[in-house]
């Protein structure tokens, strides 16, 4: 996977770094007009740090470890050049030694290392979800089960508690292990609206007997999201997928909430492509969605990357929407295209 660092795009509601403060003030004003008592901040909101869970020989990247490590070095550079970076690794000394040779001193000073065993690298899915409330920052530790039991996740599921016990994170630890929820399964606008997919959140493989919501019941799931994340509106998509995707249609692979009532989404214009019908149906769903004040969202389409296949000929997911938003940059995958 190649990586491209982009300045904030006008289509995403950010004109350029020069005007970022003006845009941030506009977003802040919007949130002040309606700020829930509990809120899951939007990804583009100011961040105390970005977490990377570093690849190693026991992760799913083992056969491509050298190449993938190079991508992570580039990720570390792009993030740490702009803001603090938290790196979780079972061998943090080795990672620190590598980055000390590859990153400039100013960026390296922004990197904090934590030792923790891990199964894989999907930090967005196994990391804390931070909710802001009248009590300050609440670090919600939801259960991660390897996307419905497809992969081992016991070590990933223990990272949050280990991180909190280091004392480096600021906020109140809140155990939410009675509910399986991955960060990539939900999008928040920071003002009470969540966007998600039924294929993931209502999938029986995410629910367990004895959980807070033991069955895939939409009403019960919505109630839990309202209580724990402060959601006031939950927008559901029932269409859209990527072939080969293990996440059961994570929203962060197909459609993303962005500033200024914008949704960026994956579009497929090739009628011969297997995704065409589903993504067309998803586009129609997005066109029907409304903001909290009843207006249609601004929709910005991302082109579907050319098909990528593994050595056996199976199609691999290449989610162009699976980018990382930071206050001063957007990092997006390019898949060498």
Please give the residue ranges for each predicted region.
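The feature marks the mature, well-folded catalytic cores of soluble enzymes
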Residues: 2-337
């Amino acid at each position: 996977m190649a990586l491209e660092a982009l300045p904030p795009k006008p289509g995403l509601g950010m004109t350029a770094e020069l005007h970022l403060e003006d845009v941030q003030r506009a977003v802040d004003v919007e949130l002040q007009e309606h700020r829930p008592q509990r809120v899951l901040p939007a990804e583009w909101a100011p961040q105390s740090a970005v977490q990377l869970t570093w690849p190693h020989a026991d992760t799913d990247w083992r056969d491509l470890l050298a190449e993938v490590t190079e991508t992570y070095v580039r990720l570390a550079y792009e993030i740490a050049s702009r803001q603090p970076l938290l790196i979780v690794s079972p061998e943090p000394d080795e990672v620190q030694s590598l980055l000390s040779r590859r990153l400039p001193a100013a960026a390296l000073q922004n990197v904090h290392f934590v030792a923790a065993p891990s199964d894989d690298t999907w930090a967005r899915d196994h990391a804390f979800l931070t909710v802001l409330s009248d009590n300050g920052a609440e670090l919600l530790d939801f259960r991660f089960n390897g996307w419905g039991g497809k992969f081992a996740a016991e070590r990933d599921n223990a990272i949050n508690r280990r991180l909190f016990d280091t004392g480096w994170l600021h906020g109140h630890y809140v155990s939410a292990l009675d509910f399986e929820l991955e960060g990539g399964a939900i999008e928040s606008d920071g003002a009470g609206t969540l966007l998600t997919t039924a294929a993931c959140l209502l999938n029986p493989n995410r629910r367990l007997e004895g959980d807070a919501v033991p069955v895939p019941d939409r009403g019960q799931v919505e109630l839990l999201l309202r209580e724990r994340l402060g959601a006031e509106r939950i927008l559901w998509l029932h269409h859209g997928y990527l072939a080969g995707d293990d996440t059961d249609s994570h929203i962060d692979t197909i459609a993303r909430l962005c500033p200024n009532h914008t949704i960026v989404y994956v579009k497929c214009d090739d009628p011969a492509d297997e995704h065409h019908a589903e993504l067309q149906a998803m586009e129609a769903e997005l066109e029907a969605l409304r903001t909290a004040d009843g207006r249609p969202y601004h929709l910005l389409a991302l082109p579907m990357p050319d098909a990528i296949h593994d050595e056996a000929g199976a199609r691999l997911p290449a989610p162009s929407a699976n980018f990382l938003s930071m206050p001063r940059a957007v990092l997006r995958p390019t898949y060498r295209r």
